[in-house]
Amino acid sequence: MAKRINRAIELLEQNQTIYYDGGHTGHVLTYEQGLKDAHIWADYINVGMEHGSFDMAGLDQYIRGLIDGGPTKSGHRTPAVIVETPVEGSSEEIIRFNAWQFRMVLARGVHGILLCQAETPDAVRAFIESCRYPINMTGVGHGLERGTRGTGSQPTSAPVWGVDADTYVDKAEPCLTLVVF
C-alpha cells in the first residue's frame, strides 16, 4: 500500500533517487496514452508544456486514462505527473502575470510543476506563493507571503488523487512537488 499519493515524494523521503520519463517538447495527452502510461517504469511522468502545447483538455483526458489504467505496481492510484509550464522564471513579475497557468495545471490534479529557468530568488518565491493556498501559513513572514492559489479546483483535482475536497486541500499543500531548476 502506498504511503503517499505521490511516489516521487515517497522515494525522496527515503533518500532514494527518482527517475522520470517524458519529453520536454510535449507529451501525447490522450486517454489512450494515459492507459498505456499507467504502468510506466518511471517514478514520475514529465509532461513538457514549456516547448509543447499548453493543452488542458488533453491533460484531463490523459490523467483520466492514468486513473482508469491504474493502480501502479507500487500501489499508487496513478504515477506522479509533473508538468513543465511555459512560464519563464526570470522575474517575479513574469511569474505573477502567468500564475493562472499554475492554477490551471494544478486544477487538473497533477502532482507537481517544474518551473523552468528559475533565475532569481524573487521569481522562485512568487512561484511558490502562486501554487500555495492562502490558508496555509507555514513560512509566511519568514520569506514567504500568503499563497494566492484559489480553492475552487477541488471538484476536479481531488478525484484524481482519490480523496475528498477537504483532504485534497490538506494533502496538496505539504506534498505538492515544486521542482525548480
Task: Show which residues each predicted segment covers.
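Expand to "…catalyze enediolate/carbanion chemistry for C-C bond making/breaking, isomerization
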Residues: 1-181
